[in-house]
């Protein structure tokens, strides 16, 4: 912060002043050098905040204070060198020491906030000043040191308030009557002739400038502290820093405050705000970071970093002069849009293609060239190949920098989601734990590619050097000095000889030949650089592949656990579409179609030859797709089509009645239907035309309105739709009945029954909806009695075993699969469309009454998964584990035969869960035919491309009984509702009705499989066994701990060590990867970790 900056600067300047009074040139130079560095950082900090300072009109004041600081710093530096080099001072050292010993007042000091005891220059008496400085001269009035000021320097903000106005040297509170100006040149003749007077003047100037220096430091601090909020400094050290970094060519999606698709707050801290970005751009700052494991927060999954910079020294020079470097380049870069590469197999293949091209076409040839005798031709060819390969390396880095890691960012951000259920939170924590090292390694690989690209250029350039140490930097800031106070009294050497001896010793300490160092072998460095790049490239491909697999595994596991909300949250913001079929992408198709397609002409009123007064008023406000189905329209047009007098659109009616609550409120919808019932004739019709209008439009519309209301209240009503003030609907039904509208009496009875319940969901039993294409959407069996429909043909209470002796392996795998199927189908049959809508919308539009049956169905499947994994992992005997694995694979195969895809998915998820799949010794003993069968079943239920294999199989089942995997429907509903806009063409006028139609299609498909029933025999003892076994199961974390006890983890240590290169290259097949792998979470291979920072 600026406060810490101020304290550090005053600390070092006080130390410098203390050593100045003590005549300690060495310590003075050290402290004063640190103070000058801090002043340079003050200037850099103001430079980085220049945009904000211009907005706040602070730039002129800051420049004035900085100019004063630099002036004081220069005066102190020049005059202190003259002072310490003065022969008069050297000859009077002993006199100064004697004066200090004889006068006890020398101990009068002021205590500063740095806890350092130093002489207070504003309170110094005559005895504390060397006698040679106390000489009087008529030519130059001397300060009267007998009287002192009462001002004391303080670090706190009270310094400025307690000090008088000190804007000019004349106003300094002291008895100084004259101070020599530095504007007049000081010649050596003056030093020789008037040495005493000059030394006294130098002391006074330095004393004054120290005072001014401190005053201006505090003023600059107060200025910045008052106008920049928390007082945070901008980023001054692009080479080394802690925390998050996302600048220049380095991208870090885990950067603090970074969100996809949103801009940062302009009022944020100067460290991260937009002005900081502009300042960095103007400085030509191209900094890259490497995450540090010491600064990684696993709670939030935030990747912190320490960065190493590749910014050149020329860019730093630009920052000092205030002129932006590469202005034109960065102004173009700001408007350049980066493409995000999805985390999938296509991106991995692209990286492999680029990497193999580099190895085969460039580095393969370079390995042959480097073994040839040294020559200019060889070096030139090596340099040419390296610079050509650099273009492809940059392309690889570009892909890595823009790799879409939104999935893992979402996983991190979900830690604060209070809506996350316990199982989802356990899955998230488990995934975060196993992913942390992989993501850290990804950032290390990125930095390693940056480093190796630069290293290759430097090493190839070194081939042309006669002296390979020409680019080696000598240690900076080395000061050659000797303390003349004591040394001259001991040794009778001339000053020049002593200085030369110190310089010689310094150069010898830095000479390579005197430090037992070997000269570099440039050819060997090039070989190591090529091999290092190959190792980094191989590790990079493995790491990206593992990230892809981890993402797919988590999605697959979440989908199989039927966590649709979790899946949607994880995929939020990703570019990849969930639905491959373009029919599902309603948002893009609707918004991208500016030329409206009105579909089949014979179904549209405006394409027929009908009288104008019978035409539909809002027909032109509807949008149709290529199949003639309504895709969108205004609310008025949709209601007109719902009660059309010309034709009945059954599919449209079903979709509207089922999803109307997402378009209207209940009161709006019913009031619009009442207004539609009270239709008025158009103006300008004749008597004959009016009679025709009544017969062909008004009466049909009234009948349609009554039928729609009747269907709504009898089949599609839920107490969640109730709103106060709907009692007028009873009067409307009575009016329709008095007008002898068909179905009005049934409507009146339905309205009275539904409104009497008001909003009471406790005793409400939804009716089953028949989604038939013939329009006979009639009420079937109430949900309360639906369980009896799925009852088996026969039942038995025993299977030949007594229940108290019944064990899992005593049950035949086919019988176990059948009983699981009966149980799953019974739970599946109870699910109603309103529960599906509740899962889809939540409380967005209204409280749909919850989804108890869906929750029970999902819990049963997840408990089955936990039970399967627990039964295997709790066995300490490897033979029993193998036996149980074979049993459950057989059960899964039988579930497949029975079309019970719910239990099939649950068992596969258990066998591929981390506690089970990591048991290498156990799986090695499982027969190959079982592993092959399991792999086939896993491929069938793979979530790749939105369960495309499973969907294809499901379509071929037809009317056979089936228990579908309900997670697919939940995902379809979630992504249809959340992945498509409610309105088309980016406005709130055209309702996206195609989105509602898609929801109806999903609910129709669910209802198809609910109508098909199994004819299986129910065994009560097995059912009771299954019920009891699915209770009180340990969590996945406890099971994983038990798995580690059964088969402890084997440590594998390998990496990219530049000193031991394990690289083999095949010119035909490309680089060979000799790294072995190990299995991690969800059964996927995890590559061996590598320490890429070892150089």
From Swiss-Prot:
Residues 626-756 form the N-terminal Ras-GEF domain. The keyword Cell membrane does not apply. Disulfide bonds: none annotated. GO terms for molecular function: guanyl-nucleotide exchange factor activity. Gene3D superfamilies: Ras guanine-nucleotide exchange factors catalytic domain, Son of sevenless (SoS) protein Chain: S domain 1. One of its GO terms (biological process) is Ras protein signal transduction. It is a single-pass membrane protein. Its main location: membrane. It is found in: Membrane. GO terms for cellular component: plasma membrane. SUPFAM superfamilies: Ras GEF. Residues 103-133, 158-178, 263-295, 309-333, 773-798, 1044-1078 are annotated as: Disordered. Promotes the exchange of Ras-bound GDP by GTP. This protein positively controls the level of cellular cAMP at start, the stage at which the yeast cell division cycle is triggered. This is Cell division control protein 25. It comes from Lachancea kluyveri.
């Amino acid at each position: 912060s600026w406060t810490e900056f101020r304290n550090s600067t005053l600390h070092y300047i006080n130390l410098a002043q203390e050593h100045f009074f003590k005549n300690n040139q060495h310590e003075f130079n050290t402290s004063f050098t640190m103070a000058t560095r801090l002043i340079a950082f003050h200037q850099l900090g103001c430079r980085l905040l220049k945009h904000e300072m211009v907005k706040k009109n602070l730039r002129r004041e800051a420049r004035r204070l900085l100019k004063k600081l630099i002036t004081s710093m220069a005066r102190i530096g020049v005059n202190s060198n003259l002072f310490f080099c003065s022969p008069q001072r050297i000859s009077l050292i002993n006199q100064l020491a004697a004066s200090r010993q004889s006068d006890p007042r020398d101990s009068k000091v002021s205590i500063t906030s740095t806890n350092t005891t130093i002489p207070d220059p504003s309170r110094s008496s005559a005895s504390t000043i060397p006698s040679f400085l106390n000489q009087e001269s008529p030519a130059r009035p001397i300060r009267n040191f007998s009287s002192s000021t009462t001002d004391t320097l303080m670090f706190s903000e009270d310094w400025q308030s307690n000090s008088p106005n000190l804007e000019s040297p004349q106003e300094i509170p002291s008895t100084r009557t004259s101070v020599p100006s530095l504007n007049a040149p000081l010649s050596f003749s003056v030093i020789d002739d008037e040495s005493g007077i000059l030394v006294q003047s130098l002391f006074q100037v330095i004393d004054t400038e120290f005072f001014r220096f401190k005053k201006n430091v505090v003023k600059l601090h107060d200025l910045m502290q008052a106008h920049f909020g928390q007082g945070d400094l901008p980023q001054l050290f692009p080479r080394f820093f802690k925390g998050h970094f996302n600048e220049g060519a380095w991208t870090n999606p885990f950067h603090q405050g970074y969100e996809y698709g949103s801009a940062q707050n302009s009022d944020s801290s100067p460290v991260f705000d937009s002005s900081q970005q502009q300042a960095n751009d103007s400085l030509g700052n191209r900094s890259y970071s490497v995450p540090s494991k010491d600064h990684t927060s696993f709670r939030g999954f935030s990747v912190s970093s320490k960065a190493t910079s590749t910014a050149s020294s020329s860019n730093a020079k630009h920052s000092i002069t205030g002129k932006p470097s590469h202005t034109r380049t960065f102004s173009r870069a700001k408007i350049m849009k980066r493409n995000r590469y999805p985390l999938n197999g296509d991106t991995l293949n692209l990286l492999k293609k680029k990497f193999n091209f580099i190895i085969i076409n460039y580095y393969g040839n370079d390995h042959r060239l480097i073994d040839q005798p040294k020559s200019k031709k060889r070096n030139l060819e090596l340099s040419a190949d390296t610079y050509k390969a650099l273009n492809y390396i940059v392309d690889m880095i570009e892909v890595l920098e823009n790799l879409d890691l939104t999935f893992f960012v979402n996983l991190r951000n979900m830690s604060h989601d209070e809506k996350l259920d316990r199982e989802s939170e356990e899955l998230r924590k488990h995934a975060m734990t196993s992913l942390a090292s992989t993501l850290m390694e990804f950032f290390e690989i990125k930095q390693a590619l940056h480093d190796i690209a630069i290293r290759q250029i430097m090493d190839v350039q070194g081939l042309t050097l006669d002296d390979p140490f020409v680019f080696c930097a000598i240690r900076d800031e080395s000061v050659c000095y000797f303390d003349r106070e004591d040394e001259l009294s001991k040794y009778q050497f001339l000053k020049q000889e002593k200085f030369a001896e110190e310089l010689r010793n310094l150069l010898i300490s830095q000479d390579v030949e005197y430090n037992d160092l070997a000269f570099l072998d440039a050819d060997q460095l090039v070989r190591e650089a090529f091999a290092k790049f190959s190792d980094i490239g191989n590790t990079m491909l493995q790491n990206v592949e593992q990230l892809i697999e981890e993402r797919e595994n988590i999605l697959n596991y979440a989908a199989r656990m039927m966590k649709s909300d979790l899946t949607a949250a994880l995929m939020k913001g990703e570019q990849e579409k969930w639905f491959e079929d373009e029919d599902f992408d309603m948002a893009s198709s609707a918004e991208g179609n500016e030329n409206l397609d009105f579909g089949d002409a014979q179904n549209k009123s405006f394409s027929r030859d009908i009288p104008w007064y019978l035409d539909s008023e809002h027909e032109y406000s509807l949008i149709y797709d290529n199949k003639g189905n309504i895709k969108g329209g205004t609310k008025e047009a949709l209601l007109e089509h719902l009660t059309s007098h010309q034709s009945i659109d059954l599919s449209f009616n079903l979709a509207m009645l089922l999803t109307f609550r997402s378009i209207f409120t209940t009161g709006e919808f019913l009031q619009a239907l009442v207004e539609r019932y009270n239709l008025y004739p158009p103006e300008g019709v004749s008597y004959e035309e009016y009679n025709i209008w009544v017969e062909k439009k008004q009466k049909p519309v009234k009948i349609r309105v009554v039928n729609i209301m009747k269907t709504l209240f009898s089949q599609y009503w839920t107490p969640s739709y109730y709103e106060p003030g709907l009692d007028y609907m009873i009067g409307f039904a009575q009016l329709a009945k008095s007008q002898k509208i068909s179905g009005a009496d049934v409507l009146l009875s339905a309205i009275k029954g539904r409104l009497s319940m008001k909003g009471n969901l406790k005793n409400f039993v939804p009716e089953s909806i028949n989604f038939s294409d013939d329009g006979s959407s009639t009420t079937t069996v109430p949900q309360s009695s639906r369980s009896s429909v799925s009852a088996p043909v026969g039942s038995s209470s025993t299977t030949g075993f007594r229940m108290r002796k019944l064990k899992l392996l005593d049950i035949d795998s086919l019988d176990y699969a059948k009983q699981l199927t009966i149980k799953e189908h019974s739970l599946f049959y109870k699910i109603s469309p309103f529960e599906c809508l509740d899962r889809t919308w939540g409380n967005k539009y209204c409280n749909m009454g919850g989804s108890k049956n869906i929750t029970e169905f999902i819990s049963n499947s997840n408990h089955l998964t936990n039970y399967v994994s627990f039964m295997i992992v709790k066995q300490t005997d490897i033979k029993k584990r193998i036996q149980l694995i074979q049993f459950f694979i057989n059960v899964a195969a039988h579930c497949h035969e029975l079309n019970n895809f719910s239990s099939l998915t649950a068992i596969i998820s258990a066998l591929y869960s981390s506690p089970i799949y990591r048991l290498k010794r156990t799986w090695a003993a499982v027969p190959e035919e079982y592993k092959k069968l399991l792999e086939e079943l896993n491929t069938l239920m793979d979530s790749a491309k939105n369960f495309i294999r499973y969907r294809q199989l499901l379509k071929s089942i037809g009317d056979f009984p089936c228990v579908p995997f309900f997670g697919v429907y939940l995902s379809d509903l979630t992504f249809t509702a959340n992945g498509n806009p409610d309105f088309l063409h980016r406005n709130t006028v055209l309702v996206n009705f195609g989105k509602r139609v898609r929801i109806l299609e999903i609910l129709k498909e669910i209802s198809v499989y609910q109508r098909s029933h199994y004819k299986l025999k129910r065994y009560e003892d097995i059912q009771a066994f299954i019920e009891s076994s699915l209770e009180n199961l340990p969590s996945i974390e406890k099971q994983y701990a038990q798995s580690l006890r059964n088969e402890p983890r084997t440590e594998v240590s390998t990496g990219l060590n530049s000193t031991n290169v394990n690289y083999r290259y095949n010119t035909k097949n490309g680089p060979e990867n000799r790294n072995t792998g190990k299995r991690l979470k969800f059964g996927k291979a995890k590559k061996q970790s590598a320490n890429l920072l070892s150089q």
